[in-house]
UniProtKB/Swiss-Prot annotation:
PANTHER family noted in UniProt: HLYC_CORC FAMILY TRANSPORTER, UPF0053 PROTEIN YRKA
UniProt record similarity statement: Belongs to the TerC family.
Main localization (coarse): membrane
Name of this chain's protein: Uncharacterized protein Rv1841c
Domain of life: Bacteria
Membrane topology: Multi-pass membrane protein
Keywords: Cell membrane, Membrane, Repeat, Transmembrane, Transmembrane helix
Length: 345
């Protein structure tokens, strides 16, 4: 083989190595949510990449096979070609062979590492979806041609993995962390896929796992309660009407003569009892008031209050003492934002 043909073949092998490295890193790094969004926009190559990602072991085996073969052939062809090129172009025929071969090998390794490995890898990491959509379609042609070899090496690798107790996976784990979801939501806002209200709502929904009951609880000093009229009886209709006029709320905790919480009343429970302010409300009408620890995550508090169908709950400290109260509305508002109505204050 003449020098020019050998040099061109070496450059072709470096390009092939770069192709396989780029395809491999693009497949691993491409985010499925972005690819699905591109597919919905009519990008057929995005669908191709998604399907390729569902056969990840075969795709990666093919890339490794291509990289390995390209590297071996480059070493076989490239180093002798560079030796001849140096001898002819720079008049180094008198240089000791050992030094000349060492210099040639260093040049080939540098070109291989820079152009065949680092550059394509960083291009793929900088724009994985774009790179995957560019490289995967022709890469799949190679995979079809090399399928017997890929299947053989893939089966051998899976057998070895099972021997050491590792279960092979057919595709990447697509589970993402809260931080990654937050990043996706922020990117969707910047790209115009979400408006500000949707962005706020989704951000609040993610935050609910880190928010505690203590973050939305109303302190005891700010609670408007109604007191029973006498031991063993409930509050009066007049007392409830007064609390309603002062606050506009529809639910009020009930306390005994000692200030201890015994339940809560909904205003609709009182409407059917007449309009005499002196009428004493039967304690049977008073609804139970559950307790939730202040350290309980809001998501768990929401589930618990919905399960027992309670709109109010006492908030307790670690020692069991009551430190405040939380309303189901407060928990929901922390998730979706403030909901205003005619009585909101």
């Amino acid at each position: 083989m003449d020098v020019l043909s050998a040099v061109l073949l070496a450059l072709l092998l470096i390009g092939a190595n770069a192709f396989f490295v780029g395809a491999e890193f693009a497949l691993i790094s491409a985010r499925r949510d972005r690819l699905e969004a591109l597919a919905e926009q009519g990008k057929a190559t995005a669908v191709t990449v998604i399907r390729a990602g569902e056969q990840l072991p075969a795709m990666l085996t093919g890339a490794q096979l291509g990289v390995t073969v390209s590297s071996i052939l480059l070493g076989r062809v490239g180093e002798p070609a560079v030796v001849k090129l140096l001898q002819l172009s720079f008049g180094l025929s008198g240089v000791p062979p050992a030094l000349l071969h060492t210099l040639s090998l260093a040049i080939v390794v540098a070109l291989h590492v820079l152009l065949g490995e680092m550059v394509p890898k960083n291009i793929a990491l900088a724009g994985p979806e774009r790179t995957a959509m560019l490289l995967v379609p022709p890469y799949l042609v190679y995979v079809r041609l090399a399928r017997p070899f890929i299947a053989f090496y893939n089966n051998c690798a899976n057998a070895i993995l099972r021997l050491v107790g590792v279960q092979p996976k057919d595709e990447l784990d697509i589970a993402v962390s809260t931080a990654e979801l937050s990043e996706m939501i922020a990117e969707s806002l910047s790209e115009g896929l979400l408006d500000h209200e949707e962005h706020t709502r989704l951000t609040r929904a993610l935050r609910i796992r880190t928010r505690l009951v203590a973050d939305v609880a109303v302190p005891l000093v700010n609670i408007r309660a109604v007191q029973v009229s006498a031991v063993g009886s409930g509050p009066t209709i007049g007392g409830v009407e007064q609390a309603l006029a002062q606050t506009g709320y529809s639910r009020f905790p009930v306390v005994d003569r000692g200030g201890r919480f015994i339940g809560y009343l909904h205003i609709k429970d009182v409407l059917t009892l007449g309009d005499n302010p002196q009428t004493v409300i039967d304690l049977a009408v008073v609804r139970p008031l559950p307790r939730v620890p202040q350290s309980l995550p809001l998501a768990d508090a929401l589930s618990r209050m919905r399960r027992i169908n309670s709109h109010l709950a006492l908030v307790t400290a670690d020692n069991g003492s009551v430190v405040g109260m939380v309303a189901l509305e407060d928990v929901v508002e922390d998730l979706v934002g403030t909901m205003r109505d005619g009585t909101h204050r």
